[in-house]
Amino acid sequence: MVKGTRFAATVWSAVALSTVLGVSRHRHAAEPTPPHRQTVPAVIWHFDSLAPGRPPAGFVFGRTGGGRVGRWIVQSAPDAPSPPNVLAQVDSDRTDYRFPVAAAPSPAFTDGSVSVRCKPVSGRVDRACGVVFRYQDENNYYLSRANALEDNVRFYYVKNGRRIQLANWTGKVTSGVWHELRVDFRADHAEVYWDGTKRIDVHDHTFSGPGNGGVWTKADSYTLFDDLTARPRGP
């Protein structure tokens, strides 16, 4: 169970469930096909059934580092990938080592993928969008984030509130447009995809057990999020 600061909400979050086939596996031609394939549920949050101005119910909100915890609310956005609504962190506290995080209420899982559509809009200290996985609490999780001020994508682990960088890719991260950030992970291996192209390949064993997925920002970043997807890996 994820831990952190909860915000009360009276309306259940707009959780759209989509069932997809289990992760396909390449097999040798002579290997028999199993008679049954277990389906794996992918949980997608579109945020479209909630009235703007409310936090999505069921999410757990926390903050790594200092400064204010943050304020996550649903907002309307005409250009949303799945209109009309998105999720945004709207507290513009400029504390540099401040990382607001919103952990989704999906069941914890160990292997699979977490992805989100994100639009970095503004921020003077930072302009970041991130996804977390194997999230234990606000001080312990894996993170990949893109930064439109630095033009890079990075991979970290956060342990006991300390953020440690493991990998970096330098390339264009454009403000004001929608992007896709996805992390596929299995055992100690993680692959980070930015706008559909793999940019980071990393191994680490800091967190090996199950945890939740979610989204993340830094400092005064004003970033929009949509179509947050948690997809456990099938057997």
Q: What residue ranges belong to the model's regions?
A:
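Short tryptophan-centered beta-strand motifs in secreted/extracellular beta-sheet-rich domains
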Residues: 47, 114-116, 178-186, 190-192
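Ligand-recognition surfaces built from glycine- and aromatic
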Residues: 34-36, 207-235
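Short, aromatic/His-centered strand-loop micro-motif at the edge of beta-sheets
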Residues: 160-180
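Extracellular carbohydrate-recognition regions
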Residues: 31-64, 226
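Short, solvent-exposed beta-strand-to-loop segments that form ligand-recognition rims
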Residues: 193-212
